Regions:
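Catalytic machinery of carbohydrate-active enzymes
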Residues: 1-367
């Protein structure tokens, strides 16, 4: 196909991804979705995600994203998530399922957002043939460029061209493929709006605070075994929040999954003891395990400040435009959101934490 980017006006774009089903990993693609909608306001965006297993909570959450017309999740592995080895499904079986999911969906442009391997490259090439669609992808190595009609430079070349450090910021990664279309990020933020469930929860559960108090949502998170190293040490976190309360009293709401309820309760006990030493008693409500991801947007969206570890609710709060302070246990530049209304701190002490939190509270919402 010889259509140039200036002549393009695709009615339906398919975005192919196969990296991770984590909340933050998928939500950070929303900046690229925004950029595509800015270029072609009337285009309909469709996500095709090749995931390792089915049933992730993020499936329903991403399907409800306001920038997507549809989202399709196709598993590429067999067996249970806990197995040491999970065999891959035969390629023909995966492709047949993809074709079935998309059989009634017109597609004009297919963008392979992945840079590694050949799985998504070959699938994009094949889908382009059966849908008679333009194909866009990343020439991470020479063989991949043969699968596309329009080719973006490799990730390292893209980074060098823009003077970006490696590894590339996670939000920036989808823009590597978009470079083939002449679409640049230009500071585009990730974005999220509460879907119907989130709006309903917010209407049914208005968060209240006393006179002169702020509403703070704390997500300690990192409850899975692989994420525990990212969880803040509870005594240090308590010390920072007590120091903040001394400067700006707040009502505190704890978020988290059901399996994070135990750590929330441990934190709550430590905080209560520390506050009592000053004669204070903060209101603390624990919502762990009680909210869907869509309902969680109704909680986060009411906060004056969200404090979170490096986990999904951190990216959700940023995307909602809520002032957000993220606590990192180690320097992780690809996970930062270098923009107004967001502060990333690495092992902060009370003084640094309080100064950053007060700055965010003063600046207010970024939507």
């Amino acid at each position: 196909m010889n259509t140039t980017t200036s002549e393009m006006n695709p009615a339906n774009i398919l975005l192919v991804k196969a990296h991770s089903m984590g909340i933050g990993d998928l939500l950070r693609s929303s900046a690229a979705w925004s950029a595509l909608k800015a270029r072609w306001p009337d285009t309909r965006l469709h996500l095709l995600m090749l995931s390792k297993q089915s049933g992730y909570a993020t499936e329903a959450f991403i399907r409800s994203h306001h920038l997507l017309a549809s989202a399709h999740f196709v598993t590429v592995k067999t067996g249970d998530p806990g197995q040491d080895r999970q065999p891959s499904r035969p390629r023909a079986q995966v492709w047949a399922e993809v074709a079935q999911r998309l059989k009634d969906q017109p597609i004009d442009l297919i963008i392979d957002c992945e840079s590694g391997g050949m799985r998504t490259a070959l699938l994009t090439w094949w889908l382009g043939r059966i849908k008679r669609a333009q194909r866009v992808g990343i020439a991470q190595f020479p063989m991949r460029r043969l699968c596309y009609d329009l080719v973006a430079p490799s990730g390292p070349r893209y980074a060098a061209r823009l003077g970006l450090p490696l590894p590339i910021d996670y939000t920036e990664r989808d823009f590597v493929a978009l470079a083939a279309l002449g679409i640049a990020r230009n500071g585009t933020r990730i974005t999220l709006k509460s879907a119907a469930a989130g709006q309903a929860w917010r209407n049914d559960h208005p968060l209240l605070a006393g006179a002169g108090q702020s509403i703070v949502v704390l997500n300690i998170g990192c409850g899975t075994e692989d994420a525990i190293p990212k969880r803040p040490e509870l005594p240090k976190l308590v010390a920072c929040l007590v120091a903040l309360y001394a400067q700006q009293p707040f009502a505190l709401h704890l978020s988290g999954a059901e399996f994070e309820r135990e750590v929330n309760q441990a934190f709550r006990g430590l905080l209560s003891t520390a506050m009592a030493q000053h004669g204070w008693q903060a209101e603390v409500l624990d919502w762990a395990g009680q909210l869907s991801l869509d309902e969680l947007t109704g909680l986060l969206g009411q906060a004056d400040l969200v404090v979170s570890s490096d986990s999904g609710p951190y990216h959700m709060a940023v995307a909602l435009g809520v002032p957000t302070l993220c606590w990192f246990n180690f320097d992780t530049p690809p996970s930062y959101h270098p923009q107004r209304g967001v502060v990333a701190l690495v092992l902060p002490g009370p003084d640094q934490f309080v100064a950053s939190a007060l700055g965010l509270l003063t600046a207010g919402c970024q939507t």
